[in-house]
Amino acid sequence: MNKLLENCLFEKDSQRYEKIKEIAISFTKEYIGNNILCDHIFSTVETYCRRNGFDVQIFRLPIEDEKIWAFTSIKKGCIFVTINTSLELNKQIFAAAHELYHIYCYIDGDDNDLVNGSILTDENAGDIDVAMEEREANAFAALILAPLKQVVQQKKIADVDSDSVAKLIILTIYLMDCFALPYKAMVIKLLECNAIQKAEAEYLLSEEKNVEAFILSREGLGSRWLKKTNDNNLNAIKEMIKKNLQEQYISEEKAKADLKLLNEFMSSMTKKKNQE
């Protein structure tokens, strides 16, 4: 069996998968509703943290090492989430949803691992020989970005028969466009929905590069989520703090503390990168 399929939570531990599905359904009901998230995931992370009494800053920065998707840490009670914007947008979205699970475990599950930091790499996202919480985070991310009921509904709307490999690829591309899931995650989602068999999933996974190249060449369905954005919102965050001070939404003391904390965090990230 394909290593990715073998190690995904759905195949590795079906009971634990069902538990994560319950958590995802409850979370969706409370914080998402009937919406399809796509790139609204970033504001959902902020909403969840703030509703639970935590300050949060999401940095969207280009990082040279594309194996790093995202990392999260806590400094002086503030949650910092950094997303690598040199990646395709659908990977950024998945990374944010993945990190949200670690934040959820910290806030609702008394998991203190975030104090030391959480990092999502290309290997973690591929579910190959990773810790159980990483598998859970990947499953959670896919479940909130593409809830099973909505996937089944969109599959029905697409009205694409899955009686051939070509049609399966068309269906996968259509659903990738709907939910902004990376290709591999979408294939596993189809398996979870019993829309495809394991053999079909293995074949689809083997065609990842060819399918993504096809999508980009046609600039059609799914292409918007495969673009690398290279966003950098660090200066925007600093300006927002200064503007909040000018508008007297926060005190001068709070603004200074926030800017100091921001600079300390970025300095610590620079040191960590240099050490690597």
Feature annotation, model-predicted:
Residues 1-276:
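Active-site hotspot residues in diverse enzymes, especially metal/ion-binding acidic/histidine motifs
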